[in-house]
């Protein structure tokens, strides 16, 4: 079949060839050649799409599983480090095709539905149960979503099933990796002064994303959140009309081409340039940053409609940071400065870029707060525990702060930087205190190390192998995304941001 709204190109080509034969002015073989050429011309859009947009994989490349800020896949874990990994909706393998960097697809370059198809899609959407019932999301901007409590809810949670989302990597599929309890999937966040939506309406959200790009930028916690988001929107994607590309690990993109939309992750663990920016060789002991240099990454952020930033976990290895001197030419020419000083310099660079380069009439900007670690069980009253291993419920009936080692100076610096963009409103999404209560939600020993699921012997040694940084999915990041969902859909497109 051709594209919607187009005449049948095969029939047109046949008629053209037949006309030539009837005219007796050309031999039959010339008419045949003309027929083939006509078919190729008529189907050029479909052929171009099939040969540039699809390739196979049995699964997405896995992320590094070590606790301590490990993020993207190691080189040996990638199907190919020079080719995109493509995964069709439904997990079916597709023909592999090499695509060079300069052929990286963009939303604007994808086939846009013609007016007839767009009208039909809109009519179908308006007739959907959620829209026909007058569904809407209206969470007041004045409501502080970060204050509340965790409520066990096995009726509406989890928001999706682990085994039904082919986009999840082995790092976060805790049930598949041997975790036997599933209570961690069934806790709903109840804000104190208002309500979050009970469900994530994927079709409603994808309609808001129609013709747009949503990009998570940062470290492996934002990658964790990206995986959650693509699972949440999955029910709105028709079979055969979405696929994932993995661009050398730097970007992972879900293409939902029936909506002409993308949901993307961009690897930039410090936001600015660093010697850890190569996703195939990022596990570097001596991490060095250029706190005033952001252009190498930021060029890929221009024009994105929804930007969700974070940076935290990669800062936590040392109390001092190595920063390249202003006149430095190599990564070896650095000075050591205090972590919070370096963090503030980076955030100043980021806020300046946002203020100078983002169009607030088009782009909404969010900054995710600190995602906490749970490596000190005595902090939540379990002195005999080992990191986050075997924790099966949130911290409950706790009054006062939890001393988990969260760097609250960095939290405040990020919040202040979100207010510093000036011309561009930035929504600071505060998930820190609520996530501190979720000692049960981490991948712990039900994850991977160097691309392989932990062995029984490794799982029996949580002091060495428990990952108490990243989160199981379904799980806590789904609630973070529900907060994004509430803020995005409660506003007109590109409305101003506030504190979530």
Curated annotation (Swiss-Prot):
Q: What topology does it adopt in the membrane? A: Single-pass type II membrane protein
Q: Identify the InterPro entries for this entry.
A: TBL, TBL_C, TBL_N
Tissue expression, as annotated, is: Expressed at low levels in roots and leaves.
Q: Which gene encodes it?
A: XOAT2
Which residues constitute the catalytic centre? 220 (nucleophile), 467 (proton donor), 470 (proton acceptor)
Protein name per UniProt: Xylan O-acetyltransferase 2
Query: Lineage of this protein's species?
Result: Eukaryota, Viridiplantae, Streptophyta, Embryophyta, Tracheophyta
* Keyword vocabulary terms for this entry: Disulfide bond, Glycoprotein, Golgi apparatus, Membrane, Signal-anchor, Transferase, Transmembrane, Transmembrane helix
Disulphide-bonded residues: 143-194, 165-231, 174-472, 388-468
Compartment(s):
Golgi apparatus membrane
């Amino acid at each position: 079949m051709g594209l919607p709204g187009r005449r049948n190109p095969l029939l047109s080509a046949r008629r053209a060839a037949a006309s030539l034969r009837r005219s007796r002015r050309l031999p039959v073989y010339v008419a045949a050649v003309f027929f083939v050429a006509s078919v190729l011309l008529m189907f050029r859009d479909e052929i171009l799409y099939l040969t540039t947009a699809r390739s196979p994989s049995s699964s997405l490349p896995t992320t590094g599983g070590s606790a301590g800020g490990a993020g993207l896949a190691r080189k040996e874990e990638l199907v190919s480090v020079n080719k995109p990994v493509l995964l069709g909706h439904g997990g079916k393998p597709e023909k592999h095709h090499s695509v060079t960097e300069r052929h990286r697809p963009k939303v604007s370059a994808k086939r846009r539905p013609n007016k007839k198809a767009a009208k039909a899609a809109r009519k179908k959407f308006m007739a959907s149960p959620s829209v026909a019932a007058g569904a809407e999301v209206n969470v007041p901007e004045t409501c502080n979503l970060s204050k509340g409590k965790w409520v066990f809810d096995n009726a509406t949670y989890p928001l999706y099933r682990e085994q039904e989302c082919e986009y999840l990597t082995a790092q976060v599929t805790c049930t598949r990796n041997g975790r036997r309890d599933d209570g961690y999937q069934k806790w709903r966040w109840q804000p104190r002064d208002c309500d979050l939506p009970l469900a994530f309406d994927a079709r409603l959200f994808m309609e808001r994303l129609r013709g747009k790009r949503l990009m998570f930028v940062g470290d492996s916690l934002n990658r964790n959140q990206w995986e959650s988001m693509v699972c949440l929107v999955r029910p709105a994607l028709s079979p055969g009309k979405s696929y994932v590309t993995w661009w050398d690990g730097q970007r992972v993109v879900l293409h939902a081409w029936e909506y002409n939309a993308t949901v993307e992750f961009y690897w930039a663990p410090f936001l600015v340039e660093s010697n850890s920016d190569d996703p195939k060789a990022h596990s570097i002991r001596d991490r060095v940053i250029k706190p005033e240099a952001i252009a190498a990454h930021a060029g890929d952020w221009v024009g994105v409609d929804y930007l969700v930033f974070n940076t935290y976990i990669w800062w936590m290895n040392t109390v001092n940071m190595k920063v390249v001197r202003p006149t430095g030419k190599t990564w070896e020419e650095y000075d050591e400065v205090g972590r919070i000083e370096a963090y503030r310099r980076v955030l100043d660079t980021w806020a300046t870029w946002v203020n100078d380069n983002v169009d607030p009439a088009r782009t909404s900007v969010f900054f995710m707060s600190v995602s906490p670690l749970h490596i000190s069980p005595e902090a939540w009253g379990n002195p005999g525990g080992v990191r986050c291993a075997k924790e099966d419920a949130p911290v409950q009936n706790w009054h006062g702060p939890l001393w988990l080692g969260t760097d609250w100076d960095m939290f405040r610096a990020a919040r202040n930087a979100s207010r510093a963009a000036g011309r561009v409103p930035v929504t600071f999404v505060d998930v820190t205190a609520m996530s501190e209560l979720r000692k049960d939600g981490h991948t712990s020993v039900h994850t991977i190390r160097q691309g392989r699921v932990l062995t029984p012997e490794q799982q029996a040694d949580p002091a060495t192998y428990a990952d108490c940084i990243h989160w199981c999915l379904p799980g806590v990041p789904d609630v973070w995304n529900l907060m994004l969902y509430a803020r995005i859909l409660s506003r007109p497109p590109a409305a101003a941001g506030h504190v979530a």
